[in-house]
Amino acid sequence: MIIDITEIMDWIPHRYPFLLVDRVLKIDPNKSITGIKNVTVNEPQFTGHFPARPVMPGVLMVEAMAQLAAVLVAKSLGSTKNKEVFLMTIENAKFRRIVQPGDTMYIHAVIDQQRANVWKFSSTVTVEGEIAAESKFTAMIKDKT
């Protein structure tokens, strides 16, 4: 099931310049999700990171992983209209390859555990078949107040 940017924006609250998932390529609710982020030189982070040699910040790769996981949570629950997804922990984040404008980040997230409103994930970012980043993280789903 492919999910385009318009539908992604129906499922998560992030918007430009902080929406870091362009398309979902595959989703298996309650299990895993794969999506992409096309990295372009026009993104605001590249004005300062780094002007002479733009490099995607590692923290934004982790954010892309978390946003994709939030889409998985939303699709698994059927809706998050009355819920909010908050990142609680980031563990074992590793950055193994430079990501730069022109690259396509393939992001994959797997649900490792889900108990009540706490969800644990493992995620990777690959570029041209090479692991660029990997991380484990935990998110909490809360009712909107």
Swiss-Prot record:
Pfam families: FabA. The keyword Lipid metabolism applies. CDD domains: FabZ (cd01288). It is an enzyme of class 4 (lyase). The keyword Cytoplasm applies. The active site is at residue 49. Keywords: Cytoplasm, Lipid A biosynthesis, Lipid biosynthesis, Lipid metabolism, Lyase. It comes from the Bacteria. It catalyses: a (3R)-hydroxyacyl-[ACP] = a (2E)-enoyl-[ACP] + H2O. It is found in: Cytoplasm. InterPro entries: FabA_FabZ, FabZ, HotDog_dom_sf. GO terms for biological process: fatty acid biosynthetic process; lipid A biosynthetic process. Its EC number is 4.2.1.59. GO terms for cellular component: cytoplasm; membrane. One of its GO terms (molecular function) is (3R)-hydroxyacyl-[acyl-carrier-protein] dehydratase activity. Its main location: cytoplasm. Involved in unsaturated fatty acids biosynthesis. Catalyzes the dehydration of short chain beta-hydroxyacyl-ACPs and long chain saturated and unsaturated beta-hydroxyacyl-ACPs. Belongs to the thioester dehydratase family. FabZ subfamily. This is 3-hydroxyacyl-[acyl-carrier-protein] dehydratase FabZ. It comes from Rickettsia africae (strain ESF-5).
